[in-house]
Swiss-Prot record:
The lineage of its organism: Bacteria, Bacillati, Bacillota, Bacilli, Lactobacillales. It is an enzyme of class 3 (hydrolase). The keyword Hydrolase applies. NCBIfam families: agmatine_aguA (TIGR03380), PRK13551.1 (NF010070). This is Putative agmatine deiminase. GO terms for molecular function: agmatine deiminase activity; protein-arginine deiminase activity.
Length: 369
C-alpha cells in the first residue's frame, strides 16, 4: 500500500517535479462522460479523447481511467483502435481533467518516485467552481498513487491544479497571478505564502508570475494555455500581432514579461513565439448539453479556449491540438522548429475545447525512474 508522507515536504526530502520534456514512463487520462459538460452525450468528446490516446500510444503507454458505467463502452472503443499500448482502469470520476485533479509526480537523484496530491475544488469550490460535488475527482490522485505504489504528500489547506504550473525541472516554475491569486483558491494565503508552498512541494527556487491567462472564467487563467518550458532556459509563449484577437493583450503581456526574465540558474529566457488560431473557436450545438443543477451551464456561441500551446510533450513526440483553423499548419511548423528531434502529431480537438480544456489538460505524465 502506498503511504502518505507526513511532517515533511518534497524539498526537505530531495524530490522535485521534473520537466515535461524529461523521460516518461506513461501518460494518465480520464474518460469524459458528463452530459452537462460535453455535447451529444459526450460521444464526440470520447472520440477525441481516444484519438489523443492513440496518438500518445505511438510513443509510450497510456493508462485510461474509466468510471464503472462506461467501462464496457471504453473497452470496446479502445479495442477498435487495435492499440496494445492503452490499458483501461476502472475508476470513478466526476469529470475528465486529470492534469488538474491527478497527482503531480516527483523524482529524486536516486531514481525514486513520489507524488503530490493537491487539494482540488473544481476550479473554485463554492465561490465559482464548475460543478458540485467534486469528491470523486478529489480522490483520483490518491487512487493513481495506489495503483502505481507511489508514496505521496497531501497539501492540507492548499488548492492547486496541475494546469496552473509549468516547471523546467531545474528550479523554475511558471504560474499566473490570475489563477493562483484568485479568491476561490487560497484566499487565506498571501502571494509570498503561495510561493513558499510551490517551493516546498515542487522543490523550485524561483517563481515567474505571468499576470494573466486567457481563460478567466473556467480555470481562472491556467498557465498551460499561455506559456510552457520546452527545455531548461527556453519557453514557448502564445503570440499574435492581431490587435483584434481576443487573446492579444494577454499574449503580448506574457511574451513581454517572459522576454525580460531569467530562470533559477540565472539564464535569460529564450522565448519562442507560438501562434494562436486565426479565428476564435465558438461552442456549437449547446442545446445538446444537459442542464444539471450544480454545474455551470454552457451556452451557444460561447468562446472555447482553443490554444495551440496546450500540447503534450511525450517521449520522442509532441501531441498538438488542431482545430481546422487557417493557422493549424503554422502551429505544427513552429512546434517542429522548437522540437527538431521529436515527431509532431496533430489531433483535432475542438470537442475537448468545447468542454473547457485541451490535450495538456486531459493528460498527466508519469516520469520514468
Amino acid at each position: 500500500m502506498a503511504k502518505r508522507i507526513k511532517n515533511t515536504t518534497p524539498k526537505q526530502d530531495g524530490f522535485r517535479m521534473p520537466g515535461e520534456f524529461e523521460k516518461q514512463k506513461q501518460i494518465w487520462m480520464l474518460w469524459p462522460w458528463r452530459n452537462d459538460n460535453w455535447r451529444l452525450g459526450a460521444k464526440p468528446a470520447q472520440k477525441a479523447f481516444l484519438e489523443v490516446a492513440e496518438a500518445i500510444s505511438e510513443f509510450e503507454p497510456v493508462s485510461l481511467c474509466v468510471p464503472p458505467l462506461q467501462y464496457e463502452n471504453a473497452l470496446a472503443r479502445v479495442s477498435e483502435l487495435g492499440s496494445h499500448n492503452i490499458r483501461i482502469i476502472e475508476m470513478t470520476n466526476d469529470d475528465a481533467w486529470i492534469r488538474d485533479c491527478g497527482p503531480t509526480f516527483l523524482v529524486n537523484d536516486k531514481g525514486d518516485l513520489r507524488a503530490v496530491d493537491w487539494e482540488f475544488n473544481a476550479w473554485g469550490g463554492l465561490v465559482d467552481g464548475l460543478y458540485f460535488p467534486w469528491d470523486q475527482d478529489a480522490l483520483v490522485a490518491r487512487k493513481v498513487c495506489e495503483i502505481e505504489g507511489v508514496d505521496s504528500y497531501k497539501t492540507k489547506d492548499f488548492v492547486l491544479e496541475g494546469g496552473s504550473i509549468h516547471v523546467d525541472g531545474e528550479g523554475t516554475v511558471l504560474v499566473t497571478e490570475m489563477c493562483l491569486l484568485h479568491p476561490s483558491r487560497n484566499p487565506h494565503l498571501t502571494k509570498e505564502d503561495i510561493e513558499d508552498k510551490l517551493k516546498d512541494y515542487l522543490n523550485c527556487v524561483k517563481v515567474l508570475w505571468v499576470k494573466d491567462g486567457i481563460d478567466p472564467y473556467e480555470t481562472n487563467g491556467h498557465i498551460d494555455d499561455v506559456a510552457c518550458f520546452i527545455r531548461p532556459g527556453e519557453v514557448a509563449c502564445i503570440y499574435t500581432d492581431d490587435k483584434e484577437h481576443p487573446f492579444y493583450q494577454e499574449a503580448k503581456a506574457a511574451y513581454d514579461f517572459l522576454s525580460q526574465q531569467t530562470d533559477a540558474k540565472g539564464r535569460p529566457l529564450k522565448v519562442h513565439k507560438m501562434c494562436v488560431t486565426k479565428e476564435p473557436c465558438y461552442l456549437q450545438e449547446a442545446a445538446t448539453i444537459d442542464y444539471v443543477e450544480g454545474s455551470i451551464p454552457r451556452e451557444e456561441g460561447e468562446m472555447a479556449i482553443a490554444s495551440y500551446l496546450n500540447f503534450l510533450i511525450v517521449n520522442g513526440g509532441i501531441i498538438l491540438p488542431q482545430y481546422g483553423d487557417e493557422n493549424d499548419q503554422l502551429a505544427k511548423q513552429q512546434v517542429q522548429e522548437m522540437f527538431p528531434d521529436r515527431k509532431v502529431v496533430g489531433v483535432r480537438t475542438e470537442e475537448i475545447a468545447y468542454g473547457g480544456g485541451n490535450i495538456h489538460c486531459i493528460t498527466q505524465q508519469q516520469p520514468a525512474t
